[in-house]
Amino acid sequence: MHRLLPLVVLALVAPAAAAPTRPPFTIAETGQGFDTIDAAVQSVRMGTATILIAPGIYHQCTVQAGGVITFKAVTPGSVTFEGTTCEGKAAFVLRGQGSTVDGIVFRGMRVADGNGAGIRTEIGDLTVRNAMFLDSQEGILGGHPSAQKIVIDHSTFAGLGQCDQSTDCAHAIYLANQGSVTITASRFERGTGGHYVKLRVPNVTITDNSFDDTRGNKTNYMIDLPEGATGLIARNTFVQGRAKENWTGFIVVGAEAKTYPSAGLRIAANDARLAPGETRSPAFVADYSRAPLAIGTNRLGAGVRGFETR
């Protein structure tokens, strides 16, 4: 009886040892698995699919050239794409018909032109939720002359931006299109240069976000709308730090051009304060557009001036 025990143990262990490892990237609709994110993306072609991503740290990137794709972490926050970019741009270069990114972390993106991003959106609508963009030159970057709709929700942007690695600055979020950008319930902190949010779009919704610049370094504005915009900026909290490259305004409208109307842009129910030890007196809203902005009641801490026309 004693001599049979090792054989029994081996018989029980062998099937488990021989079980195949499931590929980390799976098409939800078909169950087909892939070893790389790009192979999964290319399999979709012009179709519609959800790519489920297993927990792990991936030194991979992908270019979506067509179709409608949802990139979804099986467990939110457990999937990290780190340090690898495609086309010298970003971990995810998106130019399909539409994209959703859900629960994914992007970290350590750097490229030669200073614009290394987690996501580069070039064509198609984009939704980002439950994502993190960390310690990179840029978080989300994109520009296309179309009525693109971009939605960013419940996401974190930290350790992003630069103005000393290229001619033009990089920012936590920098988007340009002829449609709209919505940013909700997200956190911005520890910027390393540029603006936290820079948008060249006609319509914006920026609500219920937290901008904590206390540990920022060489940062500029919290929100820059350089060509004007209409929409809503409300219920955000802002804390401006001491190590600013440009400390003169929290929200700046129309500093470069009057491409888009700004009349009626509503800015209300926000809370803006200075970090301890900051003695300079910035404007909460600095307006170059000369349009009749709809500025409601905002809670402003000591030293923050409500409005300035430039």
Which residue stretches match the model-derived regions?
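Sec-dependent signal peptide recognition
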Residues: 2-7
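Extracellular beta-strand/beta-solenoid scaffold signature
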Residues: 38, 83-93, 112-120, 135-144, ...
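Leucine-rich solenoid repeat scaffolds
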Residues: 279-310
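Right-handed parallel beta-helix
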Residues: 54-55, 68, 72-80, 97-108, ...
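Acidic Gly/Asp/Thr-rich repetitive segments characteristic of extracellular carbohydrate-active
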Residues: 21-59
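Right-handed parallel beta-helix/beta-spiral solenoid domain characteristic of secreted/periplasmic
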Residues: 28-35, 50-52, 62, 66-114
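Flexible, charged surface loops at secondary-structure boundaries
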Residues: 19-22, 42-47, 63-65, 94-95, ...
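Hydrophobic h-region of N-terminal signal peptides that target proteins for export
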Residues: 10-18
